[in-house]
Structure formats: C-alpha cells, structure tokens
C-alpha cells in the first residue's frame, strides 16, 4: 500500500470522529430542548466507534507498510477499549441519577450501546494483530496447520467471546426495555438498543472470520456462514425499523424507526468486510476491489435521508433527532469504507 494512501485511510476515521464531536457540540449549544440533548449526546458518542475504527486501520496499515509491530498491537486496542469503556461509563452515568429525565434515559441507553459497539470494533483491532498471516494462509492449505506467530486457540476464543457477551447483554437489556414499551422512553430506547445490539452481533462474524483465518482454521462450513449471518441481521434491523414506522401514528415512533433502518445500513457496511474476507479466501475474485463501494452507498443513503429529514424537522420535531443522528451514522459508514479498502489492499489477489 502506498504510504500516502495509508495515511489517508488512517485519517478518515479521525476526521469522521471529529465531525461527529463538532456537530454534536453544535447541536447541544443550539438549544436546551430534549431533542437537542439526545441528538447532541448521541452524535458525540459515535466518535468512540470512529476511534475504534482508527485503531483497526492503524494496526492493519502499519503491518502492510512496515510489518508486524507488537507495540502497536498492544497499544492501539487499549486505546480503542479505553474509548469504549469511557463511552459506556458516560451512558451509565446518565442513567444513574435519582430523577432521570426521559431525554437522559434515552440518551444514556443509546450511548451505552454505542460504547458496546466500540468495544466490539476494538476487538476487531485486537484480532488483526497478525493480519499478514491471512493472505499467507489463503495461499496455502488447511493442512499447513496454525502458524506459530498466530494467537493461541484460547486467546482467539476470548477475542470472539467479547462481541458474543456484549451481544447477549444488549439483547437482554433491550428486550427488558421493550417489555414495558407502553412507556415512551422505554419504547424508544429498547428499539434503538436492539438495533445497536444487531451491529455487535454482526461484529461476531467479523472477529471470528479474522481469528480463524489468522489461525488457518477457517472451515468450509463457515466460509459463507458469517456472510449470511450479517446480511440476515442487517435485513432484520431494516425490517424492524419499517415495522416501527408503520405500526402506529405516534410521533415517538419516528426516531427509533428511522434510526433502525440506518443501523441496518451499518450492518450492510460490516457485511462488505466479512464478504470480502470470504471471497478472497483461497480463491481469486476479480470484483473484490468493488466491494468497498458498499459502505459508500450506505453512507450516501444515510446522508441523503438526513438532508430530507432536516427539512421535515422544520415543521415536525419528531424528525429532528434522526435528521442529526443519521449524519453521524453516515460518518461511521464512510469510516467503514476506509477499513474495507484497507482489507481489500491487504488480502485481495489482484
């Protein structure tokens, strides 16, 4: 990879994170209304995902340009995990007060869910510490065994366990909230948290794929399994969003319904990464360099939809939160474009 292109792909996650923080701060300063509070806090929290994606980009690009660096393999996942933990603590702090307002309740749950995603993405960074073994293993055969440089089976299983446990936590928590969906804050927070949990579940597939390909244990059975898993979760999340939008006439349905559809777009962006790694594993794919276009399209979907919603929010404040949050989700999708491009450069056979 060209060193200048490498730096560009490293900078994209940081720039997108700064945009999320800047827009979130601007929204918070604009008004004290509850819609501004929720949208501003959620936008700022999305920077944690961008930070975690930056650590992933840095680790892989550094290997492509300079080789494996054990210092980077330790430092950058720690940075990502630190950002995710701070984000989860921030979300929990909003929920820990004695008299939690509705806007704090919703924002706290969403921010905590964003922190869970950031932790899962940081696990992608941690599992990518020996990314160069993937094209090497793909050029060989399963009979070659596990390379001595690869993570042990125990460490690999621990890495996969992180998104699995966070997915279970998010699922149980969101279902608990939805059991009291007649309370509006529970209804909104429960649906959005369930969508965020779907992203964590998608990242199980990505972490498992990277770990197993690094260890040369990527089986024929799971070759396409994770692709189906991620596309299924993305589609279910989009359908959930559509269901929320059409299931009632209440204004409270607008934010969770629209945001769920765009969380499905993030799932599809993750699908592009899982699909790419499956496509180039012990085979040649001439279209591999087109796969990074998937997160570009999902990014454009989020941004164009946000622009329409911003106009609609002039007359209906129910559209205000999604019109702002979708800009941040578009930024996350564009950050995923840089990661998919890096994976394509490092693993695809030209």
What are these regions (language model features)?
Residues 1-3, 141-144, 343-350:
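Short, charged juxtamembrane terminal tails flanking transmembrane helices
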Residues 1-5, 67, 216-221:
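Cytosolic-side membrane-entry/anchor segment at the start of a transmembrane helix
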Residues 6-29, 38-63, 73-97, 103-134, ...:
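Alpha-helical transmembrane segments and immediately adjacent membrane-interfacial amphipathic helices
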Residues 137-151:
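Membrane-interfacial, low-structure loops and terminal tails that flank and connect transmembrane helices
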């Amino acid at each position: 990879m060209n060193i200048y292109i490498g730096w560009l792909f490293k900078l994209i996650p940081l720039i997108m994170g700064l945009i999320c923080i800047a827009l979130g701060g601007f929204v918070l300063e604009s008004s004290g209304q509850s819609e501004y509070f929720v949208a501003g806090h959620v936008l700022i929290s999305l920077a944690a995902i961008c930070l975690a994606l930056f650590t992933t980009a840095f680790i892989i690009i550094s290997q492509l340009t300079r080789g494996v660096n054990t210092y980077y393999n330790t430092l950058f996942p720690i940075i990502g995990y630190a950002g995710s933990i701070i984000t989860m603590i921030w979300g929990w702090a909003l929920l820990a007060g004695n008299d939690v307002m509705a806007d704090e309740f919703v924002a706290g749950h969403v921010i905590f869910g964003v922190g869970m995603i950031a932790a899962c993405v940081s696990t992608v960074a941690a599992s990518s510490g020996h990314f160069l073994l993937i094209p090497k293993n793909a050029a060989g055969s399963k009979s070659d065994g596990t390379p001595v440089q690869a993570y042990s089976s125990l460490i690999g299983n621990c890495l996969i366990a992180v998104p699995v446990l966070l997915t279970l936590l998010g699922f149980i928590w969101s279902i608990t909230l939805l059991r009291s969906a007649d309370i509006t804050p529970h209804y909104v927070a429960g649906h959005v948290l369930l969508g965020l949990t779907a992203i964590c579940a998608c990242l199980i597939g990505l972490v498992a794929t990277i770990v197993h390909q690094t260890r040369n244990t990527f089986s024929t059975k799971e070759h396409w399994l994770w692709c189906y898993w991620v596309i299924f979760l993305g589609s279910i999340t989009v359908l959930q969003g559509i269901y929320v939008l059409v299931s009632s006439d209440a204004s409270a349905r607008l934010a969770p319904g629209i945001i769920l559809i765009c969380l499905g777009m993030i799932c599809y962006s993750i699908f592009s990464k899982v699909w790419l790694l499956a496509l180039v594993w012990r085979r040649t794919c001439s279209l591999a360099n087109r796969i990074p276009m998937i997160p570009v399209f999902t990014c454009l979907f989020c941004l164009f939809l946000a622009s329409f919603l911003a106009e609609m929010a002039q007359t209906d404040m129910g559209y205000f939160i999604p019109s702002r949050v979708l800009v941040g989700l578009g930024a996350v999708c564009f950050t995923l474009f840089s990661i998919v491009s890096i994976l394509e450069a490092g693993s695809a056979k030209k």
